[in-house]
Swiss-Prot record:
Single annotated GO MF: argininosuccinate synthase activity
Protein's cellular compartments: Cytoplasm
Documented EC number(s): 6.3.4.5
GO cellular component term, pick one: cytoplasm
Family matches, as PROSITE patterns: ARGININOSUCCIN_SYN_1, ARGININOSUCCIN_SYN_2
Chief location of this protein within or outside the cell: cytoplasm
One GO biological process term: argininosuccinate metabolic process
Subunit structure: Homotetramer.
A Pfam family per the record: Arginosuc_synth
Protein name per UniProt: Argininosuccinate synthase
Binding site for L-aspartate: T123, N127, D128
Length: 404
């Protein structure tokens, strides 16, 4: 028996899946639907979603289209990059980090419109259902969550198309459809499905939409300088940029040089392994630059502890725990380390690679007087003998005990 819901806020893209969901909610739940379309830099026009929603009977006052690009980068991407977060050593969490923001805004719109439910288009097999719903529940557990993919029998594209045709849902024809399931925002674009379901099959070159094939990238390297303050990139080649403009600009520069591709088999939170290909050009540069500026501004033990915490932090984001107290606790600790992460990093971009070639900071802990290979007057090398002996004391004691 279906729960009674009067008004539902749907995360709506205007595409086939969410347009079918919109109509299905109206028919199955007999409820009023509010559509929410987030512009987080996915590269598609979001206004057509308004026309599609109107055509499906949504009242103009129940259509929300919000530009969240600056908030997305400033309050979600940048904090994540302060942690140098990478899931399972390769994934820069481009999809994972976008879902909490969308979920949060859905709940806010539910409160604005007096809605008593929220809905999303994530399937029952993937991680996104968890990410959306953990966000909903953390912000307002009284809202009814409707996940159509866990309820209906429209479990194929053919069935969705048939439903759309039967109910007069206009689906734009864009020529040959990509064989991949794709998701994009300012941080990345992802590809799943198709031949990628064979982990041994190499995808065709035409799949990659954001980055030049590294072999075809410019034959001349490009040098850029990123300025950092409190761990965040704030300027490019001396020009101050907003967070969203910074990431957008780095995407274009890095993409031209074939930087940021990844082909990964990852462990989903729901238990299965999944293969995905990702392009994260600007994020790849930001991560490299951030680690470089940290290398001269963080204390050794501070940096090492931060690296130990990073996998746990990344796992929390991947699994949908952005709003959890443990993620917020880790974030507070991470942000404390960033107060002196200020300076500039020079990077060399060339045919798919990004290399740090310079770094400087007024808070640099790198002191040439101590680390020089030439003669110095500040470091007595004889002191190293006692340091080594004390550190090896437990080995010495254990060795003597074993000889008894």
């Amino acid at each position: 028996m279906k729960r009674e819901v009067k008004k539902v806020v749907l995360a709506y893209s205007g595409g086939l899946d969410t347009s079918v969901i919109l109509k299905w909610l109206q028919d199955e739940y007999k409820c009023e639907v509010v559509t929410f379309t987030a512009d987080i830099g996915q590269g598609e026009e979001v206004e057509p979603a308004r026309a599609k929603a109107l055509a499906l009977g949504i009242k103009p006052e129940n259509i929300f289209i919000d530009d969240l690009r600056e908030e997305f980068v400033k309050d979600y991407v940048f904090p994540m990059f302060r942690a140098n977060a990478i899931y399972e050593g390769e994934y820069l969490l481009g999809t994972s980090i976008a879902r909490p923001l969308i979920a949060k805004r859905q709940v806010e719109i539910a409160h604005l419109t007096n809605a008593d439910g929220v809905s999303h288009g994530a399937t029952g097999k993937g991680n996104d259902q968890v990410r959306f719903e953990m966000g909903y529940l953390s912000k307002d557990s009284t809202l009814t969550v409707i996940a159509p993919w866990r309820e209906w029998d429209l479990n194929s594209r053919e069935k969705l198309l048939a439903y759309a045709e039967e109910h007069g849902i206009q689906i734009e024809k864009k020529g040959k459809k990509s064989p991949y399931s794709m998701d994009a925002n300012l941080l990345h674009i992802s590809y799943e499905g198709g031949i990628l379901e064979d982990p041994n099959a190499e995808p065709e070159d035409s799949m990659w939409l954001w980055t030049t094939k590294p072999e075809d990238a410019p034959n001349t390297p490009e040098y850029i300088t990123i300025g950092y303050e409190n761990g965040d990139p704030v300027s490019l080649n001396g020009e101050k940029l907003t967070p969203a403009t910074m990431l957008e600009t780095l995407n274009k520069i890095a993409g031209k040089h074939g930087i940021g591709r990844a082909d990964i088999v990852e462990n989903r939170y729901v238990g299965m392994k999944s293969r995905g290909c990702y392009e994260t050009p600007g994020g790849t540069i930001m991560l490299k630059g951030h680690r470089a500026i940290e290398s001269i501004t963080l204390d050794r033990e501070e940096a090492h502890l931060k690296d130990e915490l990073m996998p746990r932090y990344a796992k929390l984001i991947y699994n949908g725990f952005w709003f959890s107290p443990e993620r917020e606790m880790l974030q507070a600790a991470i942000d404390t380390t960033q107060k002196n992460v200020k300076g500039s990093v020079k990077l060399k971009l060339y045919k798919g690679s990004v290399m740090v070639v310079g770094r400087s900071s007024e808070f640099s802990l790198f002191n040439p007087e101590y680390c020089t290979f030439e003669e110095d007057a500040v470091y007595d090398q004889k002191d190293a003998a006692g340091f080594i002996k004390l550190n090896a004391l437990r080995f010495i004691i254990a060795g003597k005990a074993r000889k008894k």
